[in-house]
A protein has these predicted regions:
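Contiguous segments within soluble domain cores/interaction surfaces
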Residues: 1-10, 19-111, 117-119, 124-126, ...
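Extended, polar beta-sheet/loop recognition surfaces of beta-rich domains
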Residues: 130-139
Length: 139
């Protein structure tokens, strides 16, 4: 994905039709510019956390590792941290804590390559926050 593609995907978030469910004023959303790929082509996944409510906060310093991501029901990243705030990065965090409304694009992108045709499902879980289900069609 080029920088222009990344920028376009970031802009696309505002109008992305399928965002994650809001839980306690926050939500997770994943998006891509390539939902249809050929076998062995890559698709990159952009991760966005959003605080809708002023009482909800985001930890915007990044890039942050993506934890708790599943492809076709299998965990493919490091597991999520179980204790405390699901969006708080593991380890010592000494960055901005931003109240809502705010959007955090400061997560690393995931890159996937699928060999066989079909539909692949990607979901990002952090605590009780669950993203939208992103479908990647391999044709």
């Amino acid at each position: 994905m080029t920088e222009a593609d990344q920028f376009a995907a970031t802009l696309a978030y505002a109008t992305w039709p399928d965002k994650g469910m809001i839980v306690r004023g926050r939500r997770l959303t994943i998006l891509t510019m390539r939902e249809c790929v050929r076998p062995n082509e890559t698709t990159q996944i952009i991760h966005v956390a959003e605080a809708i409510d002023p009482s909800a906060v985001l930890y915007t310093m990044g890039p942050k590792a993506v934890l708790g991501e599943q492809v076709d029901g299998k965990l493919v990243t490091a597991p999520e941290v179980e204790d405390g705030d699901a969006l708080l990065p593991p380890g010592l965090y000494d960055g901005p804590v931003v109240p809502g409304p705010a959007v955090d694009y400061g997560y690393e992108m995931s890159t996937y390559r699928f060999e066989t045709p079909g539909v692949h499902r990607i979901v990002w879980h952090l605590g009780d926050l669950v993203s939208n289900e992103l479908l990647i069609f391999v044709e």
